[in-house]
């Protein structure tokens, strides 16, 4: 009797740990930042003027569901790299920032989207240091997978 009670408890415990989820339906794929079939903007080596606008335009895609995206712009006065582009742009001499442009914003993507076209006008402040900058896009899908795209741009 003791053996059957212990066996029953063990069987119940193991059953509670099992899952009916099908592992084949789990999202295991990174989202994509696409520039094909649109006029993607910005792209590597583009030059912008202080006081102008960067017309951001990219397509995001995921096999299951998109989540959100982030745009970050920061100076590259020290010539660091993020390693997502093979394009080399002409760079100014290294320098110390005085009034660098720092932009970092999160954007929601409506629920249930597998493809989304992101278009935003980003105003460049008139009082920022001119020079080399990185424009970074971080795209996250609903499962938490993230894709990064970094481009070198210049502000004059």
What do the predicted segments below correspond to?
Residues 4-14:
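Sec-dependent N-terminal signal peptides
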Residues 12-39:
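Bacterial Sec-dependent N-terminal signal peptides
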Residues 40-48:
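Short beta-strand segments of immunoglobulin-like
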Residues 46, 54-65, 75-77, 141:
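Extracellular acidic, Ser/Thr/Pro-rich low-complexity tracts
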Residues 99-121:
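Aromatic sugar-binding surface patches on proteins
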Residues 114, 126-131:
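Surface-exposed, short loops/turns at beta-strand junctions within beta-sandwich domains
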Residues 137-139:
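Conserved structural position at the C-terminal beta-strand
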Residues 148-156:
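C-terminal edge beta-strand
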């Amino acid at each position: 009797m003791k053996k059957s009670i212990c066996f029953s408890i063990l069987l119940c415990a193991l059953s509670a740990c099992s899952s009916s989820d099908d592992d084949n339906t789990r999202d295991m794929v990174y989202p994509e930042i696409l520039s094909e079939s649109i006029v993607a903007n910005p792209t590597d080596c583009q030059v912008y003027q202080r006081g102008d606008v960067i017309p951001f335009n990219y397509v995001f895609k995921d096999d299951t569901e998109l989540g959100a995206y982030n745009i970050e712009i920061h100076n590259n006065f020290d010539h660091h790299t993020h390693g997502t582009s093979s394009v080399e742009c002409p760079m100014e001499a290294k320098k110390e920032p005085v009034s660098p442009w720092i932009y970092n914003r999160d954007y929601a993507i409506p629920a249930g989207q597998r493809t989304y076209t992101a278009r935003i006008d980003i105003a460049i402040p008139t009082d920022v240091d001119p020079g080399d900058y990185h424009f970074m896009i971080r795209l996250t899908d609903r499962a938490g997978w993230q894709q990064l795209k970094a481009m070198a741009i210049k502000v004059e």
